[in-house]
């Protein structure tokens, strides 16, 4: 059976760390920022580590070769 291909959309959005955790950018920063406080905007910077169950699903279905 051939190897599963990595989903190209997931390849652009998620990264697997050396310890196997899945990292992604925070959601909610594309538009509508005028409604948010400065603190909310500041907290959306950088990346976040996904919960273990979500990360496991991402690795299993979308990043099979990671």
Swiss-Prot record:
GO cellular component: cytosolic large ribosomal subunit
Keywords, alphabetical: Ribonucleoprotein, Ribosomal protein
Transmembrane stretches, start-end: none
The keyword Ribosomal protein is annotated on this UniProt entry: yes
Keyword Ribosomal protein: yes
GO molecular function, a single term: structural constituent of ribosome
Any one Gene Ontology BP term: translation
InterPro entries: Ribosomal_bL35, Ribosomal_bL35-like, Ribosomal_bL35_CS, Ribosomal_bL35_sf
Source superkingdom: Bacteria
Family under the similarity heading: Belongs to the bacterial ribosomal protein bL35 family.
Full protein name: Large ribosomal subunit protein bL35
């Amino acid at each position: 059976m051939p190897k599963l291909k990595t989903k190209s959309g997931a390849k652009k959005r998620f990264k697997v760390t050396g310890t196997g955790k899945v990292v992604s950018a925070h959601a909610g920063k594309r538009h509508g920022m005028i409604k948010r406080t400065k603190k909310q905007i500041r907290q959306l910077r950088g990346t976040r580590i996904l919960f273990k169950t979500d990360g496991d699903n991402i690795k299993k279905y979308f990043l099979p070769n990671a």
